[in-house]
């Protein structure tokens, strides 16, 4: 077992304490509550202390030296999904966002044959005060500004970022007009899914319940197995180990919050292998005379234009719990569309509009999922700690041949805005 302490993009008072089990994945029940109970017990006992020097001499403290990093590097270079090829003629802008990713990201990209890699100098070295960004989370507006500006100055094909502890990966792609546009986690996850399944079709891929269903459709088209879990990478990796077989080995999993794992070398989200794989995808497309936008459009034309959004809604603190209200009077329609299926993960029951029911094979969680008759989906997650509701929306629009990408995007956005407005008014 192992522990990783990291604040990453969170404020320093919220240092993360991540516990990994012997299988290399983060812990799930019953280990989480078992360890928490032991921690509580430890607070009631005297705490034996030892100096760092003594601990080191007794072999109780082992500093991770360069050989540790080289073993990770070697493992990544031996990952069959990251095998270098000749399609490396792309330009990459990169930022470590004042975190720890730069050395390894640059090393792995060089190992894979990418020679045109420019790093944002001001953000390259670790600095816990994060002086150049308001909030060092690549999902936040403005966090990618410097790497996109660098991308523009070197005419990069992609402008990439790791978050400060380098487990997440974000990318902005050059548009035909020369500007850079961020891809969403779902867009990156779908591109990855298709690209990796082309290499290894009969595989197992998965994502979380709040991520896009496009991956499920892509998996089906490749004859692959698809699975879905609760949010959190601990579920994606532990369930993957349970579900994979010789016929369907685990290939890839992602969550919409920019977390990806490529292959079975790291049983957690890993922003470093992700940047290598995404650069290889970009290089392969460029060698074929295509861009990432072309590929995304082709996926949308094949499967439908999937569009996702999420909102946080503040609720009246004096009103009764929203989950109780929604369960007492389940909505029959949302935005004028009939609710065809309701999934209640708290009771693990899926209810169809004809009243029939079936069990849901997921751990219990305070989440409600509504599938509408037009294939739209609304997911409602009440906060356990404050009067707040997190809502995740997905719409699927037609994308016929006579429609441009811009028109399809506008149609999906209009459909999404209508759904969000109507749903929020109904709460």
Which ranges hold each PLM region?
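Ferredoxin-reductase
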Residues: 1-22
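Short beta-strand micro-motifs enriched in acidic
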Residues: 6, 381-383
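Gly/Ser/Thr-rich loops at beta-strand to alpha-helix junctions
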Residues: 10-11, 96-102, 166-168, 211-213, ...
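Short acidic, glycine/serine/threonine-rich loops at helix termini
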Residues: 13-19, 47, 103-108, 129-133, ...
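Gly/Ser/Thr-enriched, mixed-charge loops and adjacent short helices
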Residues: 15-150
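Phosphate-binding and adjacent anionic-ligand microenvironments
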Residues: 152, 156-158, 179-181, 201-381, ...
